């Protein structure tokens, strides 16, 4: 059960589903289902400059790193993500700059690495991170994804607001800083600009 992505729906549905199919034969349509879709244009930019260029050309594109939330859009709501870019090769988004009393954390940093970085400077935030999700989730989930998808039940934004965090945002070659509390405009609405 440690592989369950979220804690918000509990484990009961997983246990019920497992019991419901226990001993049943695997249906042919599951065995014969192709793994890859018919078209697979899957850009994976290796720098934030390459990502900014791709995103400017695909302003409605979906950015994926850990996919712990976005994956549910597909599996639970059958959402067509349209153009997708995979961010896990973008190493400059996976950096943590420890400046003593300040941390600058890239959007692609996993929650496991955030936890390791914040334990001393912000022990309460570290304790909170340790309590949500499983090791598998924290190894995949990124701090940028948790903020950008704007989930009203997101774990990090309230803590980051309380700590006075600032977001460093980029659109093409234009960069701006905004307090994280100003990024969240209304329920489900963020100060995000296409591209």
Q: What are these language model-derived features?
A:
Residues 1-195:
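C-terminal structural segment of proteins
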């Amino acid at each position: 059960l440690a592989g369950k992505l979220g804690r918000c729906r509990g484990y009961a549905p997983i246990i019920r589903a497992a019991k419901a199919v226990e001993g049943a034969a695997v249906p042919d349509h599951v065995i014969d289902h192709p793994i890859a879709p018919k078209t697979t244009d899957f850009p994976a930019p290796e720098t934030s400059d390459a990502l900014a260029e791709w995103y400017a050309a695909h302003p409605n594109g979906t950015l994926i790193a850990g996919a712990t939330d976005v994956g549910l859009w597909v599996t639970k709501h059958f959402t067509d993500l349209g153009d997708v870019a995979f961010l896990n090769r973008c190493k400059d988004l996976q950096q943590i700059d420890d400046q003593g009393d300040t941390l600058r954390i890239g959007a692609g940093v996993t929650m496991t690495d955030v936890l390791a970085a914040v334990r001393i400077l912000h022990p309460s935030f570290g304790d909170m991170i340790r309590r949500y999700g499983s090791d598998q989730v924290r190894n995949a989930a990124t701090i940028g994804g948790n903020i950008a998808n704007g989930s009203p039940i997101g774990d990090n934004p309230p803590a980051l607001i309380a700590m006075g965090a600032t977001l460093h945002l980029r659109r093409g070659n234009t960069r701006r800083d905004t307090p994280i509390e100003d990024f969240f405009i209304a329920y489900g609405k963020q100060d995000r600009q296409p591209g």
